[in-house]
Amino acid sequence: ERELTVMLLVDVSASRNFGAVGEAKREMMAEVAATIAFSAIQNNDKIGMIFFSDKIEKFIPPKKGRKHILYIIRELIDFQPESTGTNISLALEYMTNAIKKRCTTFLISDFVDGNDYKNALSIANRRHDLVAIQVYDRRETQLPDVGLIKLQDSERGCEQWVDSSSACLLYTSD
């Protein structure tokens, strides 16, 4: 009986909505988080969760039990954030302050964040065992070669016309 504490930090910013039906990053994030949550309950661990965007959207304190896991799963599926941006540093700082006892933390995000979060990652990793899981959709960086298209930043709402014929060269030249 391990009885460890596991925390899920789940990015609920607008960029998670990218992807095809059944393949959106939000669905992948929910599947990853649910898998970790079920694994934690099998190991008799406490599980908690923080939903974050550019603010702390919801904090679910760590608890044990099947009922608690089902609540977490329901929240993963149904939760609607108030904000659209991303602030990973804020989420890590909140978790580090809220959870005093050393825990295993899974940070599940696409890591689309205009802020520098390296220092917060370093501090959180010293206090807790931190595992970062990047949810990625290759279509975000590989535009179809269709000419002029209008793109919208889902987090900031700004729009821009892009010539995808030339953008394809820039995006795929890693």
Task: Explain the meaning of each model-derived region.
Residues 52-54, 110, 135-137:
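Cofactor-binding loop segments of dinucleotide-utilizing enzymes, especially the Rossmann-like FAD-
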Residues 46-75:
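Short beta-strand-loop
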Residues 68-103, 115, 135-137:
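Von Willebrand factor
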Residues 1-57, 104:
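An amphipathic, basic-hydrophobic helix/alpha-beta surface used to engage anionic
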Residues 97-103, 113, 119-173:
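Von Willebrand factor type A / integrin I
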Residues 16, 114-115:
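Short, solvent-exposed loop/turn segments at secondary-structure junctions
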Residues 10, 109, 133:
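Active-site flanking residues adjacent to catalytic metal/cofactor-binding acidic residues
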Residues 22, 117-118:
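Conserved strand-to-helix beginnings and helix N-cap segments that scaffold or border functional pockets
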